[in-house]
Curated annotation (Swiss-Prot):
Annotated transmembrane regions: 40-60, 73-93, 421-441, 451-471, 483-503
Localization, UniProt: Cell membrane
Organism: Aspergillus niger (strain ATCC MYA-4892 / CBS 513.88 / FGSC A1513)
Gene: chsG
This protein's name: Chitin synthase G
Molecular function in Gene Ontology: chitin synthase activity
Membrane topology: Multi-pass membrane protein
Free-text disruption phenotype from the record: Leads to elevated spore production.
């Protein structure tokens, strides 16, 4: 057998071999490049060396010096290594989809209303988003198959400017654009859901999330003392939620029969959408499907997903507020090198996942929901795609190194870490298929020398899954997976090379010539502030920080204080929980602060886990103001009359359509009044008719923007504190009503 492995050796190298080696050598060398640690290069390449030797069709002038028996052993090792890495994850996927539901199916079988549905807070950061796209995203949230009374959207603008796009959006939500001044945060009720529109100082996505979290924590401070059923959903401003997304998330997080209510975080399935298909958008669509339904499914089966993307992630708020001080820590001036910057800024979603994985007390608390879907806009140009993937690559590789070198994760998720380690070794061969093609074209090697079995097994197993996904999700573009199998290695190689050569630039989208840097006249703190003044805090050359500032000891991995921090308090019936018990366990941790972190006084209301989300001071934030408090009496009256007339017209059209399907022509006046009570929060009796003026809609706003919603007055320090409850007699619901269990009045907040 060994003799058959070595072909007849030629005396001299053919000309094609001379041509081939310089070409493939460049790719092979770049595959071995590592921007952070030569030690990692040696380990990964050394482990994968047998696979390289067994697969690459090297010239016989080289292979003739290899020991025949050693080559045979290495080839068998490569075969079984590839087989294990392909078949085992494939079996994980099959098992996962047999047990769990895949697709846009309704999983909640009993009725949901404002008493039985958990409260959900949606955080949507906005930065220079098209108003039409943003309005579509907001409508997808409030029109979800979920009780509107339990939805609270925080629309947070990353910037304080009051420009035309901002006015178009608030006008669509029912906020007049004729106000003399606009407070930082405005509350409004839109289609039955509560929306808080805020403007914060420009500082990037994470800074916007931080300010929004502080606002949420202040609004729901008293509510969280007695409840643990508040959930936080992060989505992007261009994401379109599926109607069943919220409901299916809540099923896995809280409502599943027999649930222990200990799920910490989940992500869903993100698919791409575009108005015009091209090769780039089709490849992205297939990559989204394969990356989430295959890779994240395997991770979920191994104990936890390793990335909670900011485009679609739901968190238990009580768990997130315990990690907020670590996730939102202001350490921009302490970025000693590009590694720390890529870990905490470019890969902030993976960094948050890393914190949750360490804070969890057991496996399978960070999972993927295979029935929660959303759509996001696909990148249209290759230049934008290259910048996006460069950002993803740097955030991925830095957090991957942190994860695989953290002993705590190896102890808690041994199988997950092993699978991730094996998959990272394959990144060394991202261009393997391309190299093989060049080898056949430019050398004396023949097709029979190629590892056809490896290619067939890899393509075949993955293609079977992609065909199933295409049928199940009705996304038949997934059947073009062989095209992705051929082209993606080349694109991945470009992303890696571009990321390596631009890793020294601290910028969100790519290198810039005017990036702020530290020198003998500028401190790191001044460089960061200069970048913020320029309008982009991410435009800083962090490689100048190391020589211009003292060592501050920023840890590569999370502190040991994070380990097991997400322990749960005793669960009581009806989603109440022992807050005092949870407080007792957290106080001990607060009395022992992190190194180099000043002691912080306890919150007067004992919500200690929500303190210390910033190490830069200035922890005060104002509560949102109701839109009606900003209007005159005449404006409130006009706004009320206009909204009531538009609502009645819309309800009549809806009931006529429903009546046509059921053989009914009109709905009774009594039912109409009940519908009105459900769709809008009624004014307290005796308060009189509020007055207001309906705003004039800009011509660029969609026609749906004419449907205004009336805001409800009240003290916003409590979520819907003084709001009257809607009527429940003959109340229409998106979900068939069943018998409700009794709950305490405090839960009706």
């Amino acid at each position: 057998m060994a003799e058959e492995l070595v072909p007849e050796v030629l005396v001299a190298w053919p000309t094609r071999d001379y041509i081939r080696r310089p070409i493939t050598g460049v790719f092979e060398f770049s595959q071995s490049s590592w921007p952070f640690s030569s030690r990692c290069v040696g380990e990964l390449v050394g482990i994968f060396l047998p696979v390289m030797i067994a697969i690459l069709p090297l010239p016989p002038q080289i292979t003739q010096y290899f020991p025949h028996q050693l080559v045979s052993v290495l080839q068998w090792f490569a075969f079984w290594a590839f087989s294990a890495l392909l078949i085992i994850p494939w079996l994980f996927c099959v098992n996962r989809f047999v047990i769990h539901s895949l697709g846009r199916t309704k999983r909640v079988k009993e009725a949901l209303d404002d008493r039985t549905a958990p409260k959900t807070v949606i955080v949507m950061p906005v930065y220079k988003e098209d108003p039409v796209v943003l309005i579509k995203a907001i409508d997808s949230v409030v029109n979800s198959d979920y009780p509107s009374y339990c939805i609270h959207v925080f629309l947070s603008y990353d910037g304080c400017n009051i420009d035309e796009p901002y006015l178009q959006v608030i006008n669509h939500l029912g906020i007049p654009i004729s106000l003399e001044s606009y407070p930082q945060s405005i509350d409004v009720t839109y289609q039955g859901a509560r929306i808080t529109v805020s403007r914060f100082k420009h500082g990037g996505k994470r800074h916007c999330q931080k300010q929004t979290f502080r606002l949420i924590d202040k609004v729901y401070a008293d509510y969280l003392k007695h409840h643990d059923d508040l959930f936080l959903l992060f989505i992007d401003s261009d994401c379109i939620l599926d109607k069943l997304c919220l409901q299916n998330f809540m099923y896995d997080m809280e409502l599943k029969p027999g649930s222990q209510h200990n799920m910490l975080a989940m992500t869903g399935i993100i698919t791409s959408t575009t108005e015009r298909n091209s090769l780039i958008t089709v490849l992205q669509d297939m990559e989204y499907i394969h990356g989430q339904l295959v890779e994240r499914t395997v991770e979920s089966g191994c104990g936890a997903v390793t990335c909670l993307p900011g485009a679609l992630t739901i968190l238990r708020f009580s768990a997130f507020r315990k990690m907020a001080r670590y996730y939102f820590a202001d350490k921009a001036e302490q970025c000693e090198d590009l590694f720390d910057y890529g870990k905490c800024h470019l890969g902030e979603d993976r960094w948050l996942t890393h914190l949750f994985m360490i804070g969890a007390i057991e496996r399978y608390q960070i999972q993927m929901c295979t029935s929660a879907f959303c759509k996001t806009e696909a990148v249209q140009t290759f230049c934008s795609l290259l910048k996006q993937r460069r950002r993803w690559f740097l955030g991925y590789i830095t957090n991957e190194v942190c994860m695989l070198t953290d002993v705590r994760l190896w102890k808690r998720y041994p199988l997950l870490c092993l699978v991730r380690f094996m998959q990272n070794t394959i990144r060394t061969t991202a261009l393997l298929f391309f190299i093989l093609a060049i080898s056949i074209i430019t050398t004396s090697s023949k097709i029979k020398n190629l590892p056809v079995g490896f290619i067939a097994v890899s393509l075949g197993l993955n293609y079977i899954l992609m065909v199933y996904f295409g049928i199940r999700l009705k996304r038949f573009k997934a059947w073009l997976y062989p095209l992705m199998f051929i082209l993606n290695p080349f694109f991945n190689w470009l992303y890696i090379v571009y990321g390596i050569f631009t890793a020294g630039q601290r910028t969100w989208g790519g290198p810039r010539a005017d990036a702020a840097k530290a020198d003998e006249h500028t401190t790191p703190e001044e460089a960061v502030e200069k970048a913020r003044v320029q309008g982009d805090e991410l435009n800083v050359q962090v490689d100048t920080f190391r020589t211009k500032t003292e060592e501050k000891g920023v840890p590569i991995r999370p502190s040991s204080k994070v380990n097991g921090r997400l322990s749960f308090a005793p669960q009581l019936p009806d989603r109440y929980y022992d807050y005092q018990g949870a407080l007792g366990t957290s106080l001990a941790k607060y009395l022992t602060p992190l190194p180099d972190v000043p002691r912080i006084g306890l919150h007067p209301h004992c919500s200690s886990d929500s303190v210390a989300t910033s190490d830069s001071g200035g922890n005060s934030i104002s509560l949102p103001q109701h839109v009606e408090t900003l209007m005159s009496a005449e404006e409130r009256a006009k706004l009320y009359i206009g909204s009531q007339a538009q609502e009645s017209t819309g309800l009549l059209h809806t009931q006529e359509a429903d009546g046509g399907e059921r053989g009914l022509d009109v709905q009774s006046n009594e039912d109409l009044e009940d519908n009105r009570a459900y769709e809008m929060h009624t004014i307290e009796s005796g308060s009189g008719i509020p007055s207001g003026k309906a705003p004039v809609l800009s011509s660029s706003v969609p026609q749906s923007g004419m449907q205004q919603s009336r805001a409800v007055p009240g003290n916003m320090s409590q979520p819907h504190e003084h709001l009257p409850q809607p009527k429940y007699t003959k109340r229409p619901s998106r979900i068939p009503r069943q018998k409700r269990r009794y709950m305490q009045p405090e839960q009706m907040v």
